[in-house]
C-alpha cells in the first residue's frame, strides 16, 4: 500500500520533489514503528499489577480451599479439640480429688494430747477391747441384745434410718436461743463471766517474762446458732448405737481482749518492758455435729482424766496412769492415751460405781469451718498493729485446742442428771397478795 502510494506520488509530483517524499515515507514508517513499540511496552507494563493481583487472589482461594477440603487439616483440628476437652476433664477431676475430697490434716502428736486435761476427753479404744485377754465372754450376746433393742426402738417409732428424710430443728433452735439469751442476761447482770475469767488468769502460773494479764474486752455476741438437717444414723464403729447428725451454723462475733507486758529480765530484772494488746474474735463456725447417748460404764470408752496429765514442771514421762504406783486409786477404769503403744492394759468398770449412768456424747466432723479475727497492738510509742505472725500463731493454737477436744475421733462426754422425779426438785407456782403468780422456791 505504501509502495503504491509512492509510485503514484512519483508520477504526479515532479522529480525534484521525489527525494523529499521518500524521506518523508521513511520517517513516517519509523514513527509508526516507534509508536507500535511504545504501545507494546505500555501494554506489558500495565498488565503486570493486574496479573500480580490475580495471582494473589488465586493463591488465597487455593489456600482457603486447601484448608476447607484437605482431610489432613480437618483431622488435626479434631484431634486438638478432643485433646483440649480431655485436658479440661482431667484438670476438673484432679481439682475435685485433691481439693474438694482431700483428707483432713493428720492427727496431732502424742505429747499434745495430754497438755490440758481440765476437760474430760474420751476416745474409742476398740483395739484394746478386741485384744484384751480379760474380755468378757458375754460381749457377743450383749452386742446382739443391744442391736435388738435398737431395732425394736426404730420399729415402734416408725423411723427408717436408711430412707427417712432429714428434719428441721426449728423448735430446738427456739429453745436453744431462749437458753442462750437467759445466760447472756445473767452474765450481763452479775458479770460472772468477767469474774470467772479474771480469777482464772490471776491464779494461772505465768512465765517470768510475762506480766499479769488484764481483761480489756468481752463480747458474748447477740446471735444464736442454727441447727438443721437432722438425720438419725447407725454408728460407724459397728456397735449398733444410734447417733444424730446435725448441721450447725453460727455467724456471730465472740470477742475476748487482753493486755499484758513482755518483761526483759536480762542482764538485770525489768531491763525493758513491751506492752502487748490482743483481741481475738470468732466470727464464723459451721460443721456437722454428731450426738448420741452412751452408757459411761461401757468398756469401749477410755477416759483421759486430769490425773493422767503431768503436774506443772513435771516431764511428760512422769505422768501417772491408772494402776501405777503414783496413780489415783479411786478410779476404776483404765487411763490410756489415744496414741498409746500398749493396748493390753485395760481395767474394767466397777458395776457398783455410782458415777456410772447415761451421758451425752458429742463431736464435730473434721470438715468444719472456723474463722477468727485477731487484732494485735505491740509497743508503747512506736506501735506495731496487726502483726500477721502473731495472728497466725494464735489462730493455729486455738484450732489445735479445738481439734484435741471436739473433732472426731475425739469427743466430749457430758453426764446427764437423773430424770427420776425427786421431791427436792418439785416446784409449784403460788399467788402472792397482788394476784401475781410466783415460783415457790421451797422444797
From Swiss-Prot:
It comes from the Eukaryota. PROSITE patterns: SMP. Keywords: Endoplasmic reticulum, Lipid transport, Lipid-binding, Membrane, Transmembrane, Transmembrane helix, Transport. The chain crosses the membrane at residues 81-101. GO terms for biological process: mitochondrial genome maintenance; mitochondrion-endoplasmic reticulum membrane tethering; phospholipid transport; protein insertion into mitochondrial outer membrane. It is a single-pass type I membrane protein. Pfam families: MMM1. Homodimer. Component of the ER-mitochondria encounter structure (ERMES) or MDM complex, composed of MMM1, MDM10, MDM12 and MDM34. A MMM1 homodimer associates with one molecule of MDM12 on each side in a pairwise head-to-tail manner, and the SMP-LTD domains of MMM1 and MDM12 generate a continuous hydrophobic tunnel for phospholipid trafficking. Belongs to the MMM1 family. This is Maintenance of mitochondrial morphology protein 1. It comes from Scheffersomyces stipitis (strain ATCC 58785 / CBS 6054 / NBRC 10063 / NRRL Y-11545) (Yeast). The gene is MMM1.
